[in-house]
Amino acid sequence: MREVAIVSFAQAKAKRRELDANEVEILMPVVQEAVARSGIPKREIGFTVSGSCDYVAGQPFAFVSALDAVGAWPPISESHVEMDGAFALYEAWVKLQTGEVDSALVYSFGKTSMGDPAAVLNLQLDPYTVAPLGIDAVSLAAPSLIGQQSCLRSGDA
């Protein structure tokens, strides 16, 4: 196995609601900072992979516009996982292990304030039996929480 190291990290300031900037405007300075800190010239990054959840953004193919923050010109080797940054990191690690590339840029993002999370997250449910009920996240969690409380009270936990 090849040794792999994370040589740089950058993160946008976490905000409860961001109304003044879109995902590209949030990502661009973060990606630029991470690349600059790495000391690896951008043209030498062999692979770029992102992780995000289009459901959370409330729009299909949200990751495509995020490529503007990376700067996909000249053409780059790029991939996207519809999951969090840990899965994107894993994909980059696999690519590095194959020896196909020597460096990778991994980033993940999510901006729930683009849509109403209560309405958007419902779209991830089974489209035939559960989603039509219009169950919000709190109501969906209630049976599980009631079961957990019951287990704790019984002393079986």
Feature names for model-found ranges:
Residues V101-A104:
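Flexible, low-hydrophobicity surface segments
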